[in-house]
């Protein structure tokens, strides 16, 4: 299940991409399949070990080309262990809502992105997230350890990116079918994954992800603008001019 649209990201073979807060690795794996050189960064040893196992399995199964590379790296989002202007592409998917100092984290991403490079930042969309917070205090911080600490509007996310020196461009919503699932989870208790209704809905989501039937794909596309669980904002880092100032590069991503 991908949140980022790789056509908009314009990832190319050989690009060096950072998946910051990679978690279980879904975007890192897709980037690896696309022939990129992938840095999968997370703070969790367990998540990184799982990613490393999958990278090896993908290589052994011949899913990736000889030039594709992938490396799990443990690191702190507020102090990225990379030099300035390192990455061609960056993905930060469902990370910022967990960080108290999100401004520092986005500034770090801007620092390590190459001038002219593209970044995709995804966070839970305002309406679905607001419903979750209203239904259950256990869904978010402080009752949920490591849980969500804020609710973003798209405008607020764009402001954070601009403040870090990035140029926000196109955006879209994703995963509308997942919003009711999380509302249901919050209604019965976020930790109650064995509730019959939760289990039944989860089976539908798994079926949709595996089979991708037309009816659910079409329905989700229609619902995404309103109920999409995640909002994705793409942006670029301005390129320096010969005069030493900067100029914005219009992002080559669809609006």
Q: Model-derived features: where do they sit?
A:
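Residues that recognize and position ribonucleotide moieties
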Residues: 70, 150, 225
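Conserved S-adenosyl-L-methionine
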Residues: 166-176
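An amphipathic, basic-hydrophobic alpha-helix
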Residues: 3-8, 157, 211-220
């Amino acid at each position: 299940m991908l949140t980022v649209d790789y056509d908009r990201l314009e990832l190319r073979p050989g690009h060096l991409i950072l998946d910051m807060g990679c978690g279980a690795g879904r975007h890192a794996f897709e980037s690896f399949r696309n022939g990129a050189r992938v840095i999968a960064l997370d703070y969790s040893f367990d998540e990184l070990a799982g990613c490393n196992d999958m990278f090896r399995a993908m290589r052994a199964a011949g899913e990736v080309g000889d030039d594709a590379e992938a490396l799990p790296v443990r690191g702190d989002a507020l102090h990225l262990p990379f030099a300035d202007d390192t990455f061609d592409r960056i993905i930060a998917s469902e990370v910022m809502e967990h960080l108290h100092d999100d401004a520092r984290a986005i500034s770090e991403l801007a620092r390590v992105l190459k001038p002219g490079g593209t970044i995709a930042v995804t966070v839970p969309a305002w309406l679905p997230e607001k419903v979750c917070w209203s239904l259950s205090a256990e869904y978010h911080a402080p009752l949920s350890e490591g849980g969500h600490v804020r609710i973003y509007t798209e405008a607020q996310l764009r402001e954070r990116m601009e403040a870090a020196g990035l140029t926000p461009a196109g955006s879209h919503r994703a995963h509308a079918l997942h919003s009711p699932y999380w509302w249901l989870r919050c209604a019965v208790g976020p930790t109650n994954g064995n509730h019959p209704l939760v289990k039944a809905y989860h089976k539908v989501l798994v079926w949709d992800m595996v089979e991708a039937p037309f009816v659910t794909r079409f329905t989700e596309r229609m619902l995404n603008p309103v109920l999409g669980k995640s909002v994705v904002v793409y942006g670029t880092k301005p390129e320096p001019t010969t005069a030493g100032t900067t100029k914005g590069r219009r992002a080559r991503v669809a609006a």
